[in-house]
Amino acid sequence: MEEAIRSLQQEISDFGIQSNKDLEAFRLKYTVRKGLIADLFGQLKTVAPDERPRIGQLLNTLKKNADEKQTAAEAVFSAQAARKAPALDLTLPGRRHYTGSEHPVQKVLGDMKQIFHAMGFSIATGPELELDRYNFDLLNFPPDHPARDMQDTFFITRGNPSGDVLLRTHTSPVQVRVMLDNPPPIRVICPGKVYRNEAISSRSYCVFHQLEGLYIDKNVSFADLKATIFSFARQMFGKDVKLRFRPSFFPFTEPSAEVDVTCYLCGGKGCRVCKKSGWLEIMGCGMVHPNVMRDCGIDPEVWSGYAFGMGVDRTVLLRYKIDDIRLLFENDIRMLRQFPA
């Protein structure tokens, strides 16, 4: 056993390691778990008990010498590889790292909030899963109104004792909750997601973002409403923006109007986006209906108010001249990178 150890020690000393290939051959022959050194350690149990300490010490020395030779060779070859590697040119430009940015919908929504906040409006929010009572009943919707049909509204459950549960079709329920919980005067905006059972196209989507506003005080008039909308539009779209008010109907306002702006794509000449009209609707508005105020515990003989609501996504299309609303929901990185932080 001792002679085999000395012979292997001489063999290891004479082994020339001139390349990585030689180094790998050395490792496989001597230092791996099934190499020659490990075989000798396995034979240690056949040695007489009184000789085992001395033989074991010789084996440990053998293994140490082999490991040191292997480590020294690895260090040499590693240093040689480092010297051969191309030098780092510190004058080269760094690699570009793409940073995240605010989604255009959130950017526009933030700007809208800031504009109305400067006018004295506070922000109110509410649940997206809403009761029929808040979404329709308290907003003066008659029982047979088309909006209550399955074709227009996503109902979650129907026939519950507490009322039908649905995905809200507008953020008006938030206004109802504010009126029920707070005495006038009230001045709030209500941003959030809303859901409607609509066909998806370049102009409409089944989920979109909406911002509604409510102002209730004494002697509030339609002139106050127009002044608020004109001020908002000039700050949002520029001081030269053209607006058009059209008479309309909403169950929760009387009188009611819709507000249009000049089409952003054709400049009012007529195109497929504006359906050849030259105008695009941006919001609906009107004076809060007396029935709504009574149902919410506010006396319409003492108080008056206006309400308005607009699609945030459509405002994004107007500001950035995007011709397809679906682009806002696809999370296409090529489109989103056009709106850097």
Swiss-Prot record:
Query: What CDD domains does the entry give?
Result: PheRS_alpha_core
Please classify the protein's predominant subcellular localization into one broad category: cytoplasm
A GO term from the CC aspect: cytoplasm
Q: Which InterPro entries match?
A: aa-tRNA-synth_II, aa-tRNA-synth_II/BPL/LPL, Phe-tRNA-synth_IIc_asu, Phe-tRNA_ligase_II_N, Phe_tRNA_ligase_alpha1_bac, Phenylalanyl-tRNA_Synthase, tRNA-bd_arm
Compartments where located: Cytoplasm
Reaction catalysis annotation: tRNA(Phe) + L-phenylalanine + ATP = L-phenylalanyl-tRNA(Phe) + AMP + diphosphate + H(+)
Recorded GO MF terms: ATP binding; magnesium ion binding; phenylalanine-tRNA ligase activity; tRNA binding
Q: Known EC number(s)?
A: 6.1.1.20
Among Pfam families, the record links this protein to: Phe_tRNA-synt_N, tRNA-synt_2d
Chain positions recorded as Mg(2+) binding sites: E254
Binding note for cofactor: Binds 2 magnesium ions per tetramer.
Its subunit composition reads: Tetramer of two alpha and two beta subunits.
What family is reported? Answer: Belongs to the class-II aminoacyl-tRNA synthetase family. Phe-tRNA synthetase alpha subunit type 1 subfamily.
* Protein's UniProt name: Phenylalanine--tRNA ligase alpha subunit
In its UniProt entry, the species of origin is given as: Chlorobium limicola (strain DSM 245 / NBRC 103803 / 6330)
Q: What is the lineage of its organism?
A: Bacteria, Pseudomonadati, Chlorobiota, Chlorobiia, Chlorobiales
